Structures are given as structure tokens and as C-alpha cells.
Amino acid sequence: MDELLKILGANALESRANIARMLNVPAAEVDARIAAYEKLGVIRGYQAILDEDKLDLDTVTAVIEVKVTPQREGGFNTIADRISKFPEVRSAYLMSGAYDLLLFVEGKNLRQVATFVSEKLSPLDGVLSTSTHFMLKTYKRFGVLMHQETSDERLSVAP
């Protein structure tokens, strides 16, 4: 992977001047390369990683496994594209294993997520079954630890 992309992946807020120094190139070249990556769709956006516990958000996140029937003309893409368009769906992935799709879904409460599954997702043609898991606590998101240990206590090791 390009070193510029590694730097941006670690900290998208890094100044162009610092990036230019790290790469030993002019800042104008950094700007041009970033613009080119954005135009090509390599860089799809920039996002802050939020600690939702500290924000005290009233939202519920669910991980939903979905078993689907692949479409004759589009395979898994047709149904995955359709499901991805629902505003409740934050992320969608094609997976190997017992289920075909893995969804991350957000709602205001358990009932809203349940309504999404029962009234929008499950009735879709091609959806065979779902398995919903509610997230209780986040320890790490996108490579960032959400809860830093504050003491110097060591964890006990069982024999």
C-alpha cells in the first residue's frame, strides 16, 4: 500500500505539511496525490471514530447475519445492494460461512431494530433467514481501543 495511504489511514487529520515531511516530497504533491485518490474513489471519505459511551447516545447497534438466495443475474450483489440502501444499515459485508451477509444496523431502541428485521429485511425476496445479535459494549473500533486502562494493576494469570 502507498505510504501516503498508510499515513492517512492512521490519522486523516495529519497536516499536509507533516505528511510532506514524512514522505520527503513537496506539499503540493501530497495535495495532488490525495485529490487523485479521491477522484479515483480510493479514498471514499473521512470519518471520526467516536466513543459512543462518552456521548451517551440513545442508539442500539445490532449485528445481523443474513442467509440469502443468490439471484440468477446478479448473484449476491443484487440483494446486498438492495439491503445496503436501507438507512438503518450502517455497514454490509459478503461473508463465507453459514450466513451470506453480515450487517451492522442502528436504531433508536431494540423495538426499532426488531421492526427493521421483521418488516423490512425478512420479507425481502431472497432473504431466507436472519440471526440478530445486539452489541452490548465496544472494546475496539477500527483499530482504536475504546476503553484505556487507567491503573497499573496487572491482570492475574490463572495456572
Model-predicted regions and their roles:
Residues 1-159:
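A compositional/biophysical signature of low hydrophobicity enriched in polar/charged and small residues
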